Curated annotation (Swiss-Prot):
<feature type="active site" description="Schiff-base intermediate with acetaldehyde">
    <location>
        <position position="151"/>
    </location>
</feature>
<dbReference type="GO" id="GO:0006018">
    <property type="term" value="P:2-deoxyribose 1-phosphate catabolic process"/>
</dbReference>
<dbReference type="InterPro" id="IPR011343">
    <property type="entry name" value="DeoC"/>
</dbReference>
<dbReference type="GO" id="GO:0016052">
    <property type="term" value="P:carbohydrate catabolic process"/>
</dbReference>
<keyword id="KW-0704">Schiff base</keyword>
<dbReference type="InterPro" id="IPR013785">
    <property type="entry name" value="Aldolase_TIM"/>
</dbReference>
<comment type="function">
    <text>Catalyzes a reversible aldol reaction between acetaldehyde and D-glyceraldehyde 3-phosphate to generate 2-deoxy-D-ribose 5-phosphate.</text>
</comment>
<comment type="similarity">
    <text>Belongs to the DeoC/FbaB aldolase family. DeoC type 1 subfamily.</text>
</comment>
<protein>
    <recommendedName>
        <fullName>Deoxyribose-phosphate aldolase</fullName>
        <ecNumber>4.1.2.4</ecNumber>
    </recommendedName>
</protein>
<dbReference type="InterPro" id="IPR002915">
    <property type="entry name" value="DeoC/FbaB/LacD_aldolase"/>
</dbReference>
<dbReference type="InterPro" id="IPR028581">
    <property type="entry name" value="DeoC_typeI"/>
</dbReference>
<dbReference type="Pfam" id="PF01791">
    <property type="entry name" value="DeoC"/>
</dbReference>
<dbReference type="GO" id="GO:0004139">
    <property type="term" value="F:deoxyribose-phosphate aldolase activity"/>
</dbReference>
<keyword id="KW-0963">Cytoplasm</keyword>
<dbReference type="GO" id="GO:0009264">
    <property type="term" value="P:deoxyribonucleotide catabolic process"/>
</dbReference>
<keyword id="KW-0456">Lyase</keyword>
<feature type="active site" description="Proton donor/acceptor">
    <location>
        <position position="89"/>
    </location>
</feature>
């Protein structure tokens, strides 16, 4: 697979304007990235501009804290799919996970998977807030719930992707599930290290620099 197809070209800053999003979309078309990842309010715009290409539209749910109710996340997912999203990056309920409420976490992911109507679901586990044991548990629950990917980070918390976390996540989910490294990846070398450790998708706001 060519390097550009690993990349979710990402712009999730709250101050991003329509002009910024359109620039992101044009870059994704030019460099043939896997997707653009945008906030839900921009999904329709992205869909309209990408529907005749093979660049997917990715959006976020329960972002960036993961602390909204399951019902809210399900509704967000349904609206995003209706608006044209191909991929959903949902944030896990970190506090519920850390409280040992495994069933809550698993059921929530399962409901998002169901609401996504067979679109790709990536579960952001926010590795920087978890112990090793919790990272393993988050990955296991995500897999059991039927998600397609586990993802390291929102990029809005205390840290981003680390190679050792990617390795652990890959070892936990096995070879048949996707692993997305996201947050703090700024160079091609950093991206290649993530891929070597098991990442099958890279979330980055500097996608153009990564493939130049």
């Amino acid at each position: 697979m060519k390097l550009s197809k690993y990349i979710d070209h990402t712009l999730l800053k709250p101050q991003a304007t329509e002009k910024d999003i359109l620039k992101l979309i044009e870059e994704a078309k030019t460099y043939d990235f896997a997707s653009v990842c945008v906030n839900p309010s921009w999904v329709k715009l992205a869909y309209e501009n990408l529907k005749d290409t093979d660049v997917k539209v990715c959006t976020v749910v329960g972002f960036p804290l993961g602390a909204t109710s399951t019902a809210s996340k399900v509704y967000e997912t349904k609206v995003a799919i209706k608006d044209g999203a191909d991929e959903i990056d949902m944030v896990i309920s970190v506090g519920q996970l850390k409280s040992g409420n495994d069933e809550y976490v698993k059921e929530e992911i399962k409901k998002i998977v169901e609401a996504s109507k067979n679109k790709l679901v990536k579960v952001i586990i926010e590795t920087c807030l978890l112990t090793e044991e919790e990272k393993v548990k988050a990955c296991t629950l995500s897999k059991e719930a039927g998600a397609d990917y586990v993802k390291t980070s929102t990029g809005f918390s205390t840290g981003g992707a680390k190679p050792e976390d990617i390795k652990l996540m890959r070892e936990t989910v096995g070879k048949d599930m996707g692993v997305k490294a996201s947050g703090g990846i700024h160079t091609r070398e950093e991206m290649e290290v993530m891929i070597e450790n098991g990442a099958t998708r890279i979330g980055a706001s500097c996608g153009v620099e990564l493939v130049k």
